[in-house]
């Protein structure tokens, strides 16, 4: 777990369960999961995808769309429950954690604007925290289906410290 000051972004405490015996002094391959591993962030990324749409002036929370599934070329994006909730608005889609809502917004934004917003939040780059072995994660999407899945945190990787940094930017605004 990690505790951060929402106003400053400072890490106040962080702890993890080690995969080694801490009583042995020969710890040669310890990596801190806060900074040294990148993961697919999943639905937490929807927060930032919706933010990107708002910041770029294309978000209309009352606009309706058909939830459930979205066809993108030969690929299909499904909401987690596979059937959706019928025709709903984007505000409701956000509250239901709709993959199709995030995908539609990302497709409206396009690759460049979504990537620029993710870059602005610090995804895909080191945060500069003074802990060893920080990795960058990978924010890479080119095709429409990759853009769509990135909007709900699949096909990209981030580190926990990047997610914390991005979330504290919201709390601090």
Protein language model features and the residues they cover:
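Beta-lactam-recognizing serine transpeptidase/beta-lactamase-like catalytic domain environment
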Residues: 1-38, 48-173
């Amino acid at each position: 777990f990690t505790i951060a000051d929402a106003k400053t972004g400072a890490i106040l405490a962080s702890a993890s369960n080690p995969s080694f015996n801490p009583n042995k002094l020969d710890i040669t391959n310890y990596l801190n999961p806060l900074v040294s591993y990148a993961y697919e962030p999943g639905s937490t990324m929807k927060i930032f995808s919706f933010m990107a749409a708002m910041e770029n002036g294309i978000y209309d929370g009352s606009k309706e769309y058909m939830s459930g599934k979205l066809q993108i070329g030969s690929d299909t994006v499904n909401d987690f429950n596979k059937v959706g909730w019928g025709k709903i608005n984007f505000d409701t889609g956000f509250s239901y954690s709709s993959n199709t809502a995030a995908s539609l917004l990302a497709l409206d934004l396009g690759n460049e604007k979504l990537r620029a917003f993710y870059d602005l939040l610090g995804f895909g780059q080191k945060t500069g925290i003074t802990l060893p072995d920080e990795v960058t994660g990978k924010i890479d999407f080119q095709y429409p289906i990759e853009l769509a899945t990135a909007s709900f945190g699949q096909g990209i990787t981030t580190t926990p410290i990047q997610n914390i940094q991005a979330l504290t930017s919201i709390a601090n605004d």
